[in-house]
């Protein structure tokens, strides 16, 4: 989930015509991560806010089958917008949690003190950077966050940073990254279950098994 995650601005997935770049393992020098839906359990926070602030008790995590929330949820668009604004601004009462296993794997990933890079389509980085600093077991100054404000801008940022591998939960973004020569790893979620040609992980334990030694 990212800045405008209730709408999907990317084009329909295109067939990948070029071979996927060779996968060589995850290392801080060449690997970066999306935040919402990969590090942060943001869609579960969406469900919690809907229940606690708007008394929407029927919504389940598994009901979120599209990044365009208006397509898959029987909730008024104004309520969806209000929940999203709470998430982006960090004004929500329920707590935003890390996805299970993330913290342990991040401790290993950043153990040598290298910067760990995160790229999000949120419109600004301050709120989520503070959350990352308070949540992840990384050293002071290791966390680097770029907020692009759009899904389409991720590839440009990643290429400029020398990133070759990106862990992402939005399938449309994976297609865009692949077309730009970046190897996406799809973090499996209910909203990305369409067919795709990419490497996929369903847990942080799987990501841990892919780390470069």
Task: Describe each model-derived feature in a short phrase.
Residues 3, 8-11, 16-20, 155, ...:
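Asp-based, Mg2+/Mn2+-dependent phosphohydrolase catalytic module
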Residues 83-91:
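Short glycine/proline- and acidic residue-enriched helix-loop micro-motifs
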Residues 113-114, 163, 182:
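Short phosphate-binding/catalytic loops that engage adenosine nucleotides
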Residues 6-84:
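Active-site neighborhood of HAD-like aspartate-dependent phosphohydrolases
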Residues 119-167, 171-175:
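Substrate-recognition "cap/lid" segment bordering the active-site pocket of phosphatases
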Residues 40-42, 47-48, 125-128, 155, ...:
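Short catalytic/ligand-binding loop motif for oxyanion handling, primarily in non-cytosolic enzymes
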């Amino acid at each position: 989930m990212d800045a405008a995650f209730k709408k999907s601005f990317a084009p329909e997935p295109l067939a990948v015509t070029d071979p996927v770049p060779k996968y060589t393992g995850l290392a801080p020098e060449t690997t970066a991560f999306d935040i919402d839906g990969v590090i942060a359990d943001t869609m579960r926070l969406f469900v919690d806010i809907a229940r606690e602030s708007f008394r929407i008790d029927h919504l389940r995590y598994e009901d979120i089958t599209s990044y365009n929330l208006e397509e898959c949820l029987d909730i008024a668009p104004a309520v969806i917008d209000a929940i999203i604004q709470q998430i982006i601004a960090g004004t929500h009462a329920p707590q935003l949690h890390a996805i299970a296993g993330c913290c342990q794997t991040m401790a290993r990933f950043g153990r040598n003190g290298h910067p760990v890079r995160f790229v999000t389509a949120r419109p600004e980085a301050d709120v989520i950077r503070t959350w990352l600093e308070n949540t992840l077991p990384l050293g002071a100054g290791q966390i680097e966050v770029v907020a692009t404000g759009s899904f389409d801008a991720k590839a440009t940022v990643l290429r400029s940073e020398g990133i070759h591998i990106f862990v992402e939960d939005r399938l449309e973004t994976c297609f865009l990254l692949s077309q730009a020569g970046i190897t996406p790893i799809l973090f499996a979620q209910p909203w990305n279950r369409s067919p795709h040609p990419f490497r996929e992980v369903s847990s942080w334990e799987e990501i841990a098994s892919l780390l470069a030694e």
